[in-house]
Amino acid sequence: MVVTILLSFLGVADKVPDTETIPVGLRKMKEVGLYNVILEIDLGNSTYDFNKFTVDKCCLLLENWIQWCYDNLNKNAKILINFRDIPDAMATGAVRVFQVVDFLCKLSASEGLFGLIFEEPRGKSLPEECGTWAKYIRKIMDDHKWKGHLLIHVHEKFGYSDATALQVNTCTRGR
């Protein structure tokens, strides 16, 4: 069983997250013995003020929660990181996305992350857009020789979800 822990809305004040309080979802997972986790993060401009909460601070927060999962849930936990707002993030902060992916790839060498997910939450992005995002994310992963999983979560709308999944598969095939 995998439990999703949403990092993007945890104690956000003035568009800066609470970096000290352990998310309630992680604490509950520990109580009941669950350990496979999807940590979700927003990288677009709507949730955080990245002038106050820098990409480096975001990466350190992810690293802290990942380490917390290994230390407190299970040393063999399968942890996925989900970029919840990839269309917004790629439109306004693609470099930010690539910085976080690069950081996670380097971290995965020692931490053994299971993989990455990116989400198209509105079902409005064209399959070619999602395919391009997947291609560049996978390229960063490949450049680091990280064989972690790359998954996509597309919400249904306008019939793009199936076409998008096929396009992403095509853009990352052979990797």
Identify what each model region corresponds to.
Residues L151-K157:
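Conserved mixed alpha/beta core segments that line enzyme active sites in large multi-domain catalysts
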Residues K124, K157-G159:
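Short, surface-exposed acidic/glycine-rich loop or hinge patches that mediate macromolecular interfaces
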Residues G159-A165:
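Short glycine/serine/threonine-rich phosphate/pyrophosphate-binding segments
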Residues I5, L10-V12, L39, I81, ...:
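Structural beta-sheet core signal
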Residues D18-L150, L166-G174:
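Alpha/beta enzyme core
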Residues M1-P23:
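N-terminal capping/small domains of soluble enzymes
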